[in-house]
Amino acid sequence: LCDRRQRQMCIRDRSQCVHNISGEQISVDISTLVQNLRERADWYTGLIRTQEWVTDENGNGWFNGYYDNHGRPVEGKRDNHVRMMLTGQVFSVMGNVADDAQTAAIIKSADLYLYKKEVGGYRLNTDFKEEKFDLGRMFGFAYGEKENGAVFSHMTVMYANALYQRGFVKEGYKALYTLLEQAMNTPVSLMYPGIPEYFDADGKGKYPYLTGAASWYMMTMVTQIFGFRGEWGDLVLEPKILLRQFDESGNYSAQFPFRGQTYAVVYQNPQKKEYGDYRITEVWLDGQRYAGETNTGICIPFAVLEGKENHTLRIVLG
């Protein structure tokens, strides 16, 4: 990659180009373009991992995710106050910018500075102790309302999804379940069971009609916890189910649509092993044992599944 001066020149040239689009087209070699984009992504990932990693006096670490309108980093320790925001951590974990050690550190810091079970779990940010309008409208709200320190359901669920993707299953479950518990605690949340946009400083659910969290919650349940998802057109089953989520018989079941078909799926955990200890030992497709390679997950080619509208899948864990 080019040095800093060359990068700045490239940015300047591109900024000028957008004002003078000629309409001419050129052919670009796709492999060259892919390589170029990957190199840029790797460079930015390395930069963020080192330059934007902040710590407190005890070594707890997380990413600075924002700069204010004066070009100053927002997060870290300022005037004896910790400034941490959940959003930057979510996308760092989900986008594989945070390595495994950094992800573990982020979880620890989020539990220390952002988590409050009584109000639904992970708040969007710590209390900055100032009206910082050079960062945005969030400081127009009292701490604990909306974007300023509320438990924002959408970001909490995305945090859980990111943790599941990275294999931090118990931690992802904690984020999801605390949110659910708060919503179901009607005397405090003062709402019907469901997911609100956010929980305020008193744990009250606000704006249940204004959130994308429900769809993210369901997607996380289906594709990560149940592990039922498509991959390049084929069917993947990779369960991330904790022991407490299985029923008394050690089963966990549901029905899903996939590519115009319906699947009745049951996971069986007869030895009642915890996540991390079990593997897929048997797969039964429509009553016949499937001989594909198994471990913590399995991929079934869609060619094997074509020709029927309804399927049954029984996956034995051991």
Which residues make up each language-model segment?
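Extended glycan-interaction surfaces of carbohydrate-active proteins
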Residues: 17, 42-151, 177-180, 184-199
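A general alpha-helix detector
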Residues: 88-89, 155-159
